[in-house]
């Protein structure tokens, strides 16, 4: 009889303990759900502020719609060829009627002090369709200036079909350049709603691409290749976002302003691929071509240095 009482007490005790644990579980789950809800309801700005991530760039909030743009590579007209031939300070060759490679008669020094404006102005004195290009940067790994072509007053990032590369010697003088030109763009489909700049920044934050104490220094709309086929490219409106981790480290991200896809482009990797492609094209010039002889050696030397860097 006494054993029966003890057994009953044990059963009741276990029931009370189980009920207590169930209540504890529900309470913890409710607290966790509320924390998730609070986090999801906090704005992007609040999340960035909590990690001391600042936005110094102005945000283009008035731009709400844009469309994909289909562009073919331009083939040089007789007028283009005449203009190119009229440039007295260089010797040019044209390959496949769409790729210019030109060697300056004498190296041309860059204006000092080096600024984006002064370098761009100097380069534009020597190329076709000069007003359509803007300086992206100076790649010190290869000592090459990159200029991207604009379409609809917006830069087209990292495409071989609308690109000027200016090669510099050890004294930072321009020795030769290559150029490709995009044709006129045509809207593909109707206008689409754009992801706003703060949403694009939020996309990077949610991916873990933005870290505590970093600064968003620039966000601008341009175009980035979405589809590339032979001779035709479809460019998507794209937010280019520049992040500064410290005074010496800067990263660029490209967020598709319609679909939210994120791309990263490294200028050295891009240049290496472009130089290899250009080298194969230049080898189609006549063996006795002075342009081929000079540029082929320059590209071989730079690619060899870059290959050595990759192997280290």
What are the roles of these predicted feature ranges?
Residues 124-170, 220-255, 266-267:
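Exposed beta-strand-loop-beta-strand "reactive/processing" segments of non-cytosolic proteins
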Residues 157-158, 185-194, 264-266, 274-277:
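A short, polar/proline- and glycine-enriched secondary-structure boundary/capping micro-motif
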Residues 162, 176-181, 190, 201:
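Structured extramembrane domains adjacent to transmembrane segments
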Residues 168-173, 179:
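Non-catalytic, structured segments within soluble enzyme domains
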């Amino acid at each position: 009889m006494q054993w029966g009482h003890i057994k009953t007490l044990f059963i009741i005790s276990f029931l009370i303990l189980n009920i207590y644990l169930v209540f504890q579980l529900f309470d913890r789950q409710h607290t966790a759900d509320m924390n998730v809800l609070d986090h999801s309801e906090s704005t992007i700005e609040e999340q960035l502020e909590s990690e001391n991530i600042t936005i110094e760039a102005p945000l283009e909030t008035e731009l709400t719609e844009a469309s994909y743009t289909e562009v073919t590579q331009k083939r040089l007209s007789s007028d283009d060829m005449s203009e190119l031939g009229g440039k007295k300070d260089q010797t040019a060759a044209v390959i496949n009627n769409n790729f210019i490679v030109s060697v300056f008669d004498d190296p041309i020094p860059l204006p000092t002090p080096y600024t984006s404006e002064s370098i761009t102005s100097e380069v534009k004195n020597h190329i076709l369709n000069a007003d359509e290009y803007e300086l992206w940067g100076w790649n010190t790994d290869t000592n090459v200036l990159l200029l991207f072509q604009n379409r609809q007053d917006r830069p087209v990032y990292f495409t071989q079909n609308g690109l000027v590369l200016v090669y510099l010697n050890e004294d930072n003088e321009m020795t030769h350049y290559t150029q490709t030109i995009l044709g006129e763009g045509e809207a593909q489909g109707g206008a689409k709603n754009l992801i706003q700049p703060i949403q694009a920044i939020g996309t990077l934050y949610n991916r873990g691409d933005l870290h505590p104490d970093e600064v968003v220094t620039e966000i601008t709309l341009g175009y980035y290749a979405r589809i590339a086929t032979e001779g035709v490219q479809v460019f998507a409106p794209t937010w280019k976002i520049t992040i500064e981790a410290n005074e010496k480290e800067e990263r660029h991200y490209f967020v598709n302003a319609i679909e939210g896809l994120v791309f990263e482009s490294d200028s050295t990797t891009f240049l290496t691929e472009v130089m290899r492609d250009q080298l194969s094209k230049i080898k189609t010039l006549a063996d006795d071509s002075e342009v081929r002889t000079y540029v082929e050696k320059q590209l071989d030397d730079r690619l060899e240095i870059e290959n050595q860097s990759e192997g280290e």
